[in-house]
Amino acid sequence: MKTTAFLFACVMTSLPVTAAEASEPSSGALQTLNQQAQALDRLHTVVVAYDGNIIHEHHQGGPGVAAPANVKSLSKTVLAAVTGAAIEAGVIESVEQPMVALLDSVPSAADPQVNDITVAHLLAQQAGLERTSGSNYGAWVASAHWVNDALTRPFVDRPGGRMLYSTGTSHLLSAALTQASGESTLALAQRLLGEPLGIAIPPWPQDPQGIYFGGNDMQLSPRALIAIGELYRNDGMADGQRVLPEGWVEDSWTPRGQSPWTGDGYGFGWFITTLAGEHVAYGRGYGGQALYVIPEREMTVVITSDPTPPSPGGQFQQQLNALVADLLAEE
């Protein structure tokens, strides 16, 4: 187990906040955070950044804070950032662009409603297609063609309707990025996100056609996740360079649907909630992977945990939320 507290300069400039609302967590609050973390056997790391600096790192298992870790479905939040960067770079026109305009082809067996699905619907998990997650996940990843399998599933709601959390929907976004750009999603992520942030984005699994898995199994270090959170906290700017389109963060943190499990809002790859009275945007992944941004407190928090089965269930995510809430509430 290793805990360090220090200043680590990040490259993003700060959004203006009211000074009275933004105070650095005290040493006592961080000590309490460590104690609470140690009580959670699955938890591996906790990293806290304040005002653009990493002020606290705690490691008690698994890969260290600088080592890549499987972030599971937190990959959906990262893929959303890649999509925003692709729009800023002109690879995609806008979130209103139809998905089919970006794909090389659509199977003839697909419902005509697929023509109504936009990039925004993919980002917000509102494609309307039957989910490939949950009980459908095993059959989907065992299929010979993940993209076609997702596209030919029946519609259970209209495009733009209720949130239907589905990794297949995110995978369609990865396919759209690849086929629209002529680059792999990995190459796009490295060029448009990794390079401006100065972070490593290693290869992760691909489908049978070579499309990088959209929305699962990316490998990123906790420090890299902090950099992505800080990019959002600073309105898409990194070291004076615009990486995400102007207004992207506000759009991403505007709820378009609602989680059927927690009731939290969901925007473009981010859940929206309130912890200790503070507005919080967060991404999450199976087993206890989480990235929190608390803009009014100038804070970004990353938590990684054991990603292997069995699942600790929703209760573990509630415990992670409670860790962050207690940190925010501590005077």
What is each of the regions a protein language model found here?
Residues 312-331:
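Short, gly/Ser/Thr-rich active-site loops of penicillin-recognizing serine hydrolases
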Residues 52, 69-95, 122, 173-177, ...:
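Active-site SXXK
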Residues 5-16:
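Bacterial N-terminal signal peptides
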Residues 169-176, 216-237, 289-305:
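Active-site-proximal alpha-helical segments within enzyme catalytic domains
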Residues 201-202, 249-301, 310:
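Active-site Gly/Thr loop motif
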Residues 34-64, 291-292, 300-302:
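A short, well-structured edge-of-sheet supersecondary motif
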Residues 70, 89-127, 152, 180-220:
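Active-site helix/loop module of the DD-peptidase/beta-lactamase fold
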Residues 90-94, 133, 178-190, 236-244, ...:
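Structural helix-adjacent loops and short alpha-helical linkers that scaffold large soluble proteins
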